[in-house]
């Protein structure tokens, strides 16, 4: 859902994703917004109705809510938009990307550990969080670099748009 919202004209305004027209280009902005919202609701429904102990479902749902919310992906997306109006420090870029990308990866990793029956206070949860943070950073640095060094054909989406939009990136 987050990528559908990220492609909208009010966010990144991307026309292509993986070489295909973005949802809002194919179906319109209203449908794309609703599709993103519906996918988010479906994620919570899937978590809360999974055949797991109730306390695991609740912990997983809370993990996703925190990862997606104002102190997670949504907060990072807001910083991303603010990064178009001023130049961020490297520390601010790192914070933005940790929220924008890292928090949902963190939620996915932690929910996997929880679904395996590991309690929240187990060191495995902290290990999953560290893993997600490093993977999120690597993904974002690579994505930022490819945005200036790659081609639209290679990426399946426009490149160079971060510079055009004056976005704060690792590059």
Across the structure, where does each feature detected by a protein language model lie?
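All-alpha prenyltransferase/terpene-synthase fold signal
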Residues: 1-171
């Amino acid at each position: 859902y987050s990528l559908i919202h990220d492609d909208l004209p009010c966010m990144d305004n991307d026309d292509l994703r993986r070489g295909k027209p973005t949802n809002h280009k194919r179906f319109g902005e209203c449908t794309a917004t609703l599709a993103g919202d519906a996918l988010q609701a479906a994620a919570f429904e899937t978590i809360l109705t999974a055949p797991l102990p109730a306390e695991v479902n609740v912990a997983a749902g809370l993990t996703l809510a925190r990862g997606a919310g104002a102190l997670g992906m949504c907060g990072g997306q807001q910083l991303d938009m603010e990064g178009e109006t001023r130049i961020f420090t490297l520390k601010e870029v790192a914070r933005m990307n940790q929220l924008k990308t890292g928090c949902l990866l963190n939620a996915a990793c932690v929910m996997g550990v929880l679904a395996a029956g590991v309690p929240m206070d187990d060191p495995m949860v902290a290990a999953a969080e560290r893993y997600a943070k490093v993977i999120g950073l690597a993904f974002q640095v690579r994505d930022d670099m490819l945005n200036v060094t790659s081609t639209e054909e290679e990426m399946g989406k426009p490149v160079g748009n971060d510079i055009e939009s004056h976005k704060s990136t690792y590059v």
